[in-house]
């Protein structure tokens, strides 16, 4: 890559690189590659190459696979299955790259095969499915749910809400509502966030957390976009 001078990076003159206001509030989105001295042309090319490899590269390199006419999944190549973390990360990549078709394909696959409508985990997504859609487990991993919700909110703001499962913001709010309120009635499962200490659980059935699941920058936006009754929870 060709490097450019620091003065050409586009970072606002005089602004501290450790400014704590945040990009959402400041409306200034830092380009860390540019700050390291790479040209925008090189950055755009590198990012697009990575996306094309993941989604449309050779079979021994890609891990996105179209399924039928309107669905697709991301494969965990080490286990040859589809997992909610990979599916939700894939949706986040697509909305960041303005790739609505791929986003909708992944989301439809997740809703069709991973979403659970019965049992104590109804309203959550099965964390692992075979690539034909058969569920490997009937449990959920909360990191997938929180990434699904944020990707859906971003999609709503970027493309607007559609109908059915493509009413992105409605789907996100419903998912977060279940994550917070499940278990309030006896025999209805457990919430993904502990109602007492507000910490995300490793799995709903256990009372310990996973540090890698904690995404406070997500929760700040959930406090703005989730159901109004749940916003104080996300602000806590």
Task: Give residue spans per PLM region.
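Short glycine/serine- and small hydrophobic-enriched flexible loop segments
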Residues: 91-98, 147-158, 217-224
């Amino acid at each position: 890559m060709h490097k450019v001078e620091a003065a050409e990076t586009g970072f606002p003159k005089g602004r501290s690189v450790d400014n704590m206001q945040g990009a959402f509030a400041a409306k200034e989105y830092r380009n860390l590659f540019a700050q390291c001295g790479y040209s925008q042309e090189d950055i755009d090319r590198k990012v697009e190459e990575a996306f094309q490899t993941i989604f449309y590269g050779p079979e021994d390199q890609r891990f996105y696979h179209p399924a039928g006419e309107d669905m697709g999944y991301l494969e965990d190549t080490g286990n040859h299955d589809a997992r909610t973390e990979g599916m939700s990360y894939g949706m986040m990549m697509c909305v960041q790259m303005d790739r609505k078709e791929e986003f909708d394909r992944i989301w439809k696959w997740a809703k069709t095969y991973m979403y659970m409508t019965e049992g104590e985990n109804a309203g959550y997504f099965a964390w692992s499915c075979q690539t034909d859609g058969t569920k490997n487990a009937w449990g959920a991993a909360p990191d997938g749910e929180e990434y699904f919700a944020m990707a859906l909110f971003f999609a709503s703001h970027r493309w607007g809400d559609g109908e059915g499962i493509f009413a992105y913001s409605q789907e996100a709010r419903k998912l977060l509502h279940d994550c917070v309120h499940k278990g309030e009635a006896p025999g209805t499962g457990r919430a993904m966030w502990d109602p007492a200490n507000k910490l995300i659980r490793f799995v709903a059935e256990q009372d310990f957390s996973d540090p890698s699941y904690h995404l406070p920058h997500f929760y700040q936006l959930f406090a703005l976009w989730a159901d109004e009754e749940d916003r104080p929870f996300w602000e806590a």
